[in-house]
Curated annotation (Swiss-Prot):
The lineage of its organism: Bacteria, Pseudomonadati, Pseudomonadota, Gammaproteobacteria, Pseudomonadales. It is found in: Cell inner membrane. GO terms for biological process: regulation of ubiquinone biosynthetic process; ubiquinone biosynthetic process. This is Probable protein kinase UbiB. Keywords: ATP-binding, Cell inner membrane, Cell membrane, Kinase, Membrane, Nucleotide-binding, Transferase, Transmembrane, Transmembrane helix, Ubiquinone biosynthesis. The keyword Translocase does not apply. It comes from the Bacteria. It comes from Pseudomonas savastanoi pv. phaseolicola (strain 1448A / Race 6). PANTHER family: CHAPERONE-ACTIVITY OF BC1 COMPLEX CABC1 -RELATED, PROTEIN ACTIVITY OF BC1 COMPLEX KINASE 7, CHLOROPLASTIC. It is a multi-pass membrane protein. The active site is at residue 288. The gene is ubiB.
Length: 539
């Protein structure tokens, strides 16, 4: 294993030298002792041919040479436009995850091992030549004994050791970058590699992908917008996924779409509607919607329907994130930059101590030039990217779900404008957002929220008792500071006030109840009142 790791290191070094990636490294603001290293690197003494390749192209070619794990890492980096220079991010978008298929017999043996049955006992037909092959898995067409046409996705054998080895080197490089460069620390390279580690290992678990596909299919059951293939759970395993085979046109097949007279304007608008439906209605979105994973049904081209596959990567937003995102978009298009800044602080995306006026000015400086364009030409994805870039200067915490959202929005937006160049994303999205905002404050929604809060009332007494017990325990080795010196005094007093008010309200509500219920439910209110008084008056 150690020998393989050393060989891999030499391979990485050769690729770095070949594409002169050290030029990219030494262009960064590094400590003097790191910059001095360039004078002792032997290959920098040798005469070099003038390269006509840009730094972005060299970086992309280097990742391609290093193999599929680095290719997928580059694809992940391409979504982080808030971290990368634009020229490098554009080049990384061109990375293609295509590798030669592995041996057919190996695939068959692995499928039979996972299913615990022979191929001929499960499938009436199995095509040994794969339909597609990528770094993590390859796909074969087949037909179940029951007659359904399916595809069989099988994970490449022996991937985990290779992934572990490459991830180890990526972590080493990321930690080195954080130690030697203050600028690198702002980009959180270790966190980026950790996000990639989770993504790549999630993709190795095909049961997770099957569950994601089933959820997305259920969300759009009977919809005119999107179709998701059926998963055949009886034949799904951690390394094998069997699902319905779909037939449709690749979404980028403009000639094919034109031949069947597809309504391109409606198709583009429905793509936007699918995105906002996933974000705001379901809070569950397909986060890998590049053109290779999207098809268009050949049925009813005048009312076109999308087909989505490969749900290995999905994202979700909390209700709070949904609300702040919608309000941010409305505030931005009203040019209310103070509101945008305040929402970032209120949401916790940037630190609470951020100076609101400075943050507002920075957002205005970055975003005001965008409005020089007609509204239909403004890119939602670029808006989010600019906002994230600005917020990073104010120590915005990396929000993985928002990164996935930005990536998905850029894909959907780019695809929509490719289908219909005059697509006005804001006009298409605005009615949906306004309807969602109205529903958020509708009596039905408010009643549902109130009901969920009432369901928590029985737990309050237990939580209060636990709080009082913890506060009454003696401190064995670290005696507490005097009450008036404690930094959390205002917070605890605020909690005390909340308990006092909550106890009073609960007592009033229960006093309206029947007498037989009163004796059973009055004691939680009493405990809340006592706890609140204790926290407020204690010295």
């Amino acid at each position: 294993m150690k020998l393989l790791a050393v060989r891999r290191l030499f391979r990485i070094q050769r690729v770095v030298i070949r594409y002169r990636l050290d030029d990219l490294l030494f262009a960064l603001p590094l400590p003097w002792w790191m910059l001095a290293v360039r004078f002792v690197l032997p290959w920098r003494w040798l005469p070099r041919r003038k390269s006509e390749l840009s730094r972005g192209v060299r970086f992309r070619l280097a990742l391609q040479d290093l193999g599929p794990i680095f290719i997928k890492f580059g694809q992940l980096l391409s979504t982080r436009r808030d971290l990368l220079p634009e020229d490098i991010a554009d080049e990384l978008m061109l990375l293609q995850d295509r590798v030669p298929p592995f041996d057919q017999q190996v695939a068959i043996n692995l499928i039979e091992e996972q299913l615990g049955a022979r191929i001929c006992d499960v499938f009436s037909r199995f095509d040994e030549t794969p339909l597609a092959s990528a770094s993590v898995a390859q796909v074969h067409a087949a037909c179940l004994k029951t007659g359904e046409e399916v595809v069989v996705k099988v994970v490449r054998p022996g991937l985990k050791p290779v992934i572990g080895q490459d991830l180890a080197w990526l972590f080493i490089l990321a930690r080195m970058a954080e130690r030697v460069s203050a600028d690198a620390r702002l980009l959180h390279p270790v966190q980026v590699v950790m996000d990639y580690e989770k993504t790549i290992y999630d993709e190795l678990d095909l049961l997770r992908e099957a569950a994601n596909s089933s959820q997305l299919r259920r969300n759009f059951e009977g919809s005119d917008l999107l179709y998701v293939p059926q998963v055949y759970w009886d034949w799904c395993r951690p390394k094998v996924l069997v699902m319905e085979r779909i037939y449709g046109l690749q979404v980028t097949d403009m000639a094919g779409l034109a031949d069947q007279r597809t309504d391109m304007k409606l198709l583009a608008e429905r793509g936007v509607e699918i995105f906002f439906t996933q974000i705001f209605r379901d809070s569950f979105f397909h986060a890998d919607m590049h053109p290779g994973n999207i098809f268009v049904s050949t049925v009813n081209p005048w009312s076109p329907k999308y087909i989505a596959i490969d749900c290995g990567i999905v994202g979700s937003l909390t209700p709070e994130d949904q609300d702040y995102l919608a309000r941010n978009l409305f505030a931005f298009f009203k040019r209310d930059y103070r509101r945008v800044a305040q929402l970032h602080i209120d949401s916790g995306w940037v630190p609470a101590e951020t100076k609101l006026n400075e943050f507002e000015a920075a957002i205005r400086t970055v975003c005001e030039p965008i409005f020089e364009k007609p509204l239909k030409d403004i890119s939602f994805g670029q808006v989010l990217m600019r906002l994230f870039q600005t917020a990073r200067r104010f120590n915005m915490e990396v929000q993985p779900q928002l990164v996935l959202l930005q990536k998905t929005l850029l894909n959907i937006e780019g695809l929509g404008r490719q289908l219909y160049p005059d697509l006005d994303l804001w006009s298409t999205a605005q009615p949906y957002l306004e309807r969602w905002m109205r529903e958020r404050v509708s009596p039905k929604t408010l009643f549902g929220n109130l009901q969920s809060q009432v369901e928590q009332l029985p737990h309050i007494a237990g939580m209060t008792r636990d709080l009082l017990e913890r506060m009454s325990r003696p401190h064995a080795s670290d005696p507490p500071r005097p009450w008036h010196e404690r930094k959390d005094e205002p917070v605890l007093r605020l909690i005390g006030a909340a308990l006092l008010v909550g106890g009073a309200i609960q007592g009033w509500v229960m006093s309206e109840a029947a007498t037989q219920l009163l004796t059973l439910t009055a004691w939680p209110a009493a405990i809340m009142l006592i706890a609140g008084l204790y926290l407020i008056v204690r010295r």
